[in-house]
Design a protein with these regions (language model features):
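N-terminal and secondary-structure boundary signal
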Residues: 2-342
Length: 342
């Protein structure tokens, strides 16, 4: 883990320093709350970039910068923008790097956006299983990285919220409550982990958006969303939030009984694109999974974008060349029939 670049203020714990950074970042953002208008229409010919990364010691920043360039993202689009990075922080398991988005991926993403002239970069998450997002932040190792880089963290489970129209209309959730911090961002990035999921089949950049739903409204572990149906809720949230970019950490992913109890699997890739749906479909193919067999991806096809390989402009590595079949469990209904043909 990198050494902190800034000493902590005298008398402050790391958690207190992170909270102060978070408050300062949110004050600096300053814009009035209100949901961004969704991107009109679905991109039916999106680009997805795949980079090899053998482990977390390689130059992740170079891979992400190349990916951004391949996707046409440069200073013209990012300069002066408030960027929000939304990692996958599930459980405070120290040393279990296959559970949460790796801290060094977040660090590399923050540096890449700063280099493009972003006005600010904030890391924000509403941990799903634990009420204390700060505990998950610290034990995941991300807190140390944020403190070292002077990056603010925002707990999306608490704080002011506002109601927006549910633009998906698939579940019975009705209107959605979202954090004001999400609305203040100009550019939202879902920085997910590549994992098998016990109930949904896979959890990638779209399922990662459960973490933007405030626990103060939707409970723990976001039980309201579960009661409304995991897959319909994924579709509604993805259609409403519409992240500007998805990055999936597949350097070490999780197979088997994910998203918490599974085993680490070294897939050795970073996957990124402007369409969460196309990114997730590409990730599935890398995992040896047919995206059309994942119910919520199939339902999103044609509504939020495309899952068809022929329509996705692949950049970087060929997904077939980096395929690493993730283990599926025969006794889990959501895993049956997912395997992609050779």
């Amino acid at each position: 883990m990198p050494e902190p670049k800034h000493a902590l203020p005298a008398g402050l714990t790391r958690r207190q320093a992170l909270k102060l950074l978070g408050a300062a970042g949110l004050v600096a953002a300053g814009a009035a709350a209100g949901c961004k208008s969704p991107v009109p229409g679905a991109d039916m010919a999106p680009s997805v970039f795949v980079a090899k990364a053998a482990d977390y010691t390689v130059d992740l920043g170079a891979s992400l910068r190349r990916g951004l360039a391949e996707l046409g993202l440069g200073p013209t689009e990012i300069a002066g923008k408030r960027v929000l990075l939304k990692p996958n922080l599930v459980e405070p398991h120290a040393g279990a790097g296959h559970i949460n988005t790796h801290p060094l991926v977040i660090q590399a993403a923050a540096e890449a956006f700063a280099a493009l002239g972003a006005a600010s970069v904030t890391v924000a998450e509403g941990a799903g299983h634990r009420r204390d997002s700060w505990l998950v932040l610290e034990e995941s190792g991300l807190g140390e990285v944020l403190a070292a880089e002077g990056l603010p963290f925002c707990d999306l489970n608490t704080g002011p919220v506002h109601v927006v129209q549910n633009l998906g209309g698939v579940s019975r959730l009705g209107d959605l409550w979202l954090p004001d911090a999400l609305a203040r961002a100009d550019f939202v990035v879902s920085v997910a982990k590549m994992k098998i999921h016990h109930w949904a089949g896979v959890t990638l950049s779209m399922k990662n958006l459960f973490g933007v739903m405030p626990g103060s409204i939707y409970g723990w572990p976001k039980n309201v969303l579960h009661f409304a149906g995991i897959e319909p809720s994924i579709l509604d949230i993805a259609a409403t939030v519409r992240p500007n970019l998805a990055i999936v950490d597949g350097i070490v992913g999780m197979d088997g009984d994910g998203p918490i109890m599974g085993d680490p699997v070294a897939a050795g890739v970073l996957v990124m694109g402007r369409s969460c749906l196309a990114v997730d479909a590409t990730c599935c193919r890398i995992m040896g999974i047919d995206p059309a067999a994942v119910a919520y991806l199939r339902q999103a096809d044609g509504r939020l974008g495309t899952i068809e390989a022929a329509r996705i402009r692949q950049r970087g590595e060929d997904p077939a060349a980096v395929r690493r079949d993730f283990a599926l469990l025969d006794y889990v209904p959501a895993h049956r029939g997912l395997r992609l043909a050779p």
